[in-house]
């Protein structure tokens, strides 16, 4: 059995607070129509591309017409990335999943 040290708990809490700070900053940027410049500042081109790919993965998993292997070929993403997306989608709150279906599959 592994035990987590107070040090690792403190680091995890600090990282969570930093994440929440970023989320609030992004919310404020949207309110002031500065979200695109903020995201371009905060994310590298590769990170922005990876986020776009993840959206496509979630979209296709929700659509349910392709296997994970087909998604790998279609999107050029690693099977581990697709599997993580699938597992995350399975554990997502029902409300979020329904919202994603409405937003991502509305043109389907």
From Swiss-Prot:
Location of the DNA-binding region in this protein: 68-91
Instruction: List localization entries.
Output: Cytoplasm
> At the top level of its lineage, which domain of life is listed?
Bacteria
Which residue ranges run through the membrane? none
* Cellular component annotations (GO), alphabetically ordered: cytoplasm
State the InterPro entries in the record.
Answer: Trp_repress, Trp_repress_bac, Trp_repressor/repl_initiator, TrpR-like_sf
Q: What is a GO molecular function of this protein?
A: sequence-specific DNA binding
Self-association and partners: Homodimer.
HAMAP family assigned:
Trp_repressor
Family recorded in the similarity comment: Belongs to the TrpR family.
Q: What does this protein do?
A: This protein is an aporepressor. When complexed with L-tryptophan it binds the operator region of the trp operon (5'-ACTAGT-'3') and prevents the initiation of transcription. The complex also regulates trp repressor biosynthesis by binding to its regulatory region.
Name under which the protein is recorded:
Trp operon repressor
Which lineage ranks, top first, belong to the organism behind this chain?
Bacteria, Pseudomonadati, Pseudomonadota, Gammaproteobacteria, Enterobacterales
